[in-house]
Amino acid sequence: MHDLVIRNGLVVDGSGEKPFTGDIAIDDEKISLVSESIKDNGKKEIDAEGKLVTPGWVDIHTHYDGQVCWDPYLTPSSWHGVTTAVMGNCGVGFAPVKPGEENFLIQLMEGVEDIPGSALHEGIEWDWETFPQFLNAIEKKEFVMDLGFMIGHGPLRSYVMGHDRCQNQVDASESEINKMSELVTEAINAGALGFSTSRTILHRDIYGKYVPGTEASSEEMRALAFGVDKAGEGTLEITSDWLDEEIEMSWMKEYVKKSNCGLTFLQTNGDAVKTILFSEEHFLKGKNIRPQFPGRNVGLMFGFESSLNPFMQYPAYKEIAHLPHDQKYEIMKDADFKNKLLSQKPNLEEEIEKKLAETDNTKTREEIEKDAELLINLTTNYKTQFVLGTPPNYEPKKEDSIAEISQKKGISELEVMFDEMMKNNGTNLIYAAFTPYENYKLNFVEQAYGLKSSVAGGSDGGAHCGLICDASMPTTNLSHWARDREAGKKFPLEKLVRKQTKDTAETFGLFDRGEIKTGMLADINIIDFEKLNVSHPRMIHDLPLGGKRLIQDATGYVATIKRGQIVSENGSATGVLPGNLIRGKQTCEVKSDISKVSFFDRTIRLAFIKLAQLYWKYNKKQIKSTIVSSTS
């Protein structure tokens, strides 16, 4: 008799092959049998007729580094079928750290990932100094899913150089570089899944300074990359603007050429064409190089409860901004208040003077004025701001934009924003497309998902608490791209499932999960596909000290199974916590990815890439929006 048998489900097994109807037997933590019909009974059985049965989602771009200290369920990701989460992304994290310097790492995390510093101060125990000690501390806790960690460039540079020198982007000395490389190797030998770095000007601490490593030299990056290689396993994760693609590519090329370890980077637009082509070429040649692509536009949520809305610098709003939401809403319902607010202009001078007077301010007036101007532009780009419906549509049409609604109603864009955000007792949200949204279509994502090397990534679960809510991305990847999309091409379920299971798992050497096959971990989702949806995001105050965060519920998850145990049924947690800390590469008898690409297919794709690279060399301006599709 088996521990658990799932019967009659439509199995989308994570391999990318066509779905099939069958049964799955589970014993202990693993899948013991997959068959058209299993004769033996189970101690517990689930009838999955009419339902999808998939591997549990493997989300490789999260920021639950602090939340693991107080939330064993890692919500909202666990509500969306995630059974494995990788954190330590973007070069931020909480180890290593010298006693007394914890606040610096909190300031980095708060600035980069918009996680309230007060919650981090209250919720983290800090019973570690080194990265191996950090892993030991996490391993003592219980979780609903498996957790993997990378060592981040920010804490690493701070630990070796001191936070004053590391933050000012000074070059590390040769001895400091060697020490950092040694600590990367030490971390991976202790169980870290890799090393992460941030090379984007968007990532800053709470005072506006670039995070450590943003402008680190090629020599430093090369040494840290080969710190991964020296350990013999692990993956290098980069978040980059690719502002100087040639310089960034120089050390990456050497790493990929000489190392058999992994490389992954978050890609949110199509500008880094050369890097994308480089990734596809070397993946087809057998290297573990994986660009991550979000399945929807990175979207900011503007509302009266969120961290941003277009009225934040208006005098009338500033007078009530400190009030609890219910009191604020009662005031804003008054027509006189609305008229007063809409008649005003933002008072930037007061905010600029306030910033200049701050003790820790290091910016000039000109820099602060520029930041204020950018913020105004961000909140008033009405052509790419949309009313977020229920269920939300993450590929909205032009007519859904604030600009179009304003024109249709004959009122100002600001009045449209105010009226929409006041709905549902002032909790309604406006969706602002932050990354490029050309022609009101997710064409870039469509092209990216056609790449063999691409994986689903960028949910940022646990981060951007008051402004972004993309931890639900694994759910919308299926509901939108396989079922609901109207703006263009859809993808078959088997392709989408693989992108966020087998492919993401193998990016970090987790070969024991991501497929429904005998011997694999029994991490499984049972899904009512017709009911699969995400809710309208909502604000809750459940972080330590009452900190706020946006969350998003899901419908359609009949059950989520982790290591053979049912952790969620019909959206409710069962209370079982079978998740483990992942220490390093995990093995199982699985064929390599490259064997899945036929010789003919690989040859044709490589030929396309070579042509594309030549075309890019001589026609850079013409190629940016079209070249990726030539490889799909």
Task: Name the predicted role of every residue range.
Residues V58-I60, A85-M87, L147-I151, F195-T197, ...:
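Hydrophobic faces of well-ordered beta-strands that scaffold small-molecule active sites
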Residues E369-D371, N443, Q447-S454, S459-D460, ...:
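C-terminal cap of metal-dependent C-N hydrolases
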Residues M1-V5, L10-G56, P537:
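Histidine-rich, glycine-flanked metal-binding segment
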